[in-house]
Amino acid sequence: MIEYVRGIIEDIGQDYVVIDFMGIGIKVFVPFSTLKVLPSKGNITKLYTYLQVREDGFQIFGFKTKEELDLFEKLLSVSGVGPKGALSILSVVSIDNFVKAVNAGDYKALTVAPGIGKKTAERIILELKDKLPKEIVFEGDNNFSNEALEALLALGYTKSEAIYALADITCDSVEDAVKQALKKLMK
């Protein structure tokens, strides 16, 4: 529905920002991971969004990267996890640590998020284990993963963005891995 919102930051709260978009103030709920990388009030920002429509109104949830939005949507697909629970997880667990925890079956790493108990964490692991990337896969030398990761970090991407972009990529060289990852990040 609304792919993203770009505008001037008018207000910053504990779990939201208000973005002025053509004279309309849009309240966007964001995880702490997004909040800490936003520019200050008065600056322009772009957030990828998820629109939740309910009987009593609607809410917009925003994320600095498409990867965060994608993980948020995957979390919402888990029975018993709503937008606030998904935001809670994304606020305290990075994407790469989340993927590692789910693939390792480490429910304790997820229970650090407020409102996420043992049963919910176990359900998240059960339902998302096959929907998340396992790890970076290369056909040749395994040092490619580290070199490709370092290249993406040098280009200004965060570690979690770079790991997500390199996940499940099969290639023969560092150059191919970086090219494929950049294509994934540009989508």
Swiss-Prot record:
Residues 140-187 are annotated as: Domain III. InterPro entries: DNA_helicase_Holl-junc_RuvA_I (IPR013849), Hlx-hairpin-Hlx_DNA-bd_motif (IPR003583), NA-bd_OB-fold (IPR012340), RuvA (IPR000085), RuvA_2-like (IPR010994), RuvA_C (IPR011114), RuvA_C_sf (IPR036267). GO terms for molecular function: ATP binding; four-way junction DNA binding; four-way junction helicase activity. Residues 65-136 are annotated as: Domain II. Residues 1-64 are annotated as: Domain I. CDD domains: UBA_RuvA_C. Keywords: Cytoplasm, DNA damage, DNA recombination, DNA repair, DNA-binding. Pfam families: HHH_5, RuvA_C, RuvA_N. It is found in: Cytoplasm. Homotetramer. Forms an RuvA(8)-RuvB(12)-Holliday junction (HJ) complex. HJ DNA is sandwiched between 2 RuvA tetramers; dsDNA enters through RuvA and exits via RuvB. An RuvB hexamer assembles on each DNA strand where it exits the tetramer. Each RuvB hexamer is contacted by two RuvA subunits (via domain III) on 2 adjacent RuvB subunits; this complex drives branch migration. In the full resolvosome a probable DNA-RuvA(4)-RuvB(12)-RuvC(2) complex forms which resolves the HJ. Belongs to the RuvA family. The RuvA-RuvB-RuvC complex processes Holliday junction (HJ) DNA during genetic recombination and DNA repair, while the RuvA-RuvB complex plays an important role in the rescue of blocked DNA replication forks via replication fork reversal (RFR). RuvA specifically binds to HJ cruciform DNA, conferring on it an open structure. The RuvB hexamer acts as an ATP-dependent pump, pulling dsDNA into and through the RuvAB complex. HJ branch migration allows RuvC to scan DNA until it finds its consensus sequence, where it cleaves and resolves the cruciform DNA. This is Holliday junction branch migration complex subunit RuvA. It comes from Thermoanaerobacter pseudethanolicus (strain ATCC 33223 / 39E) (Clostridium thermohydrosulfuricum). The gene is ruvA.
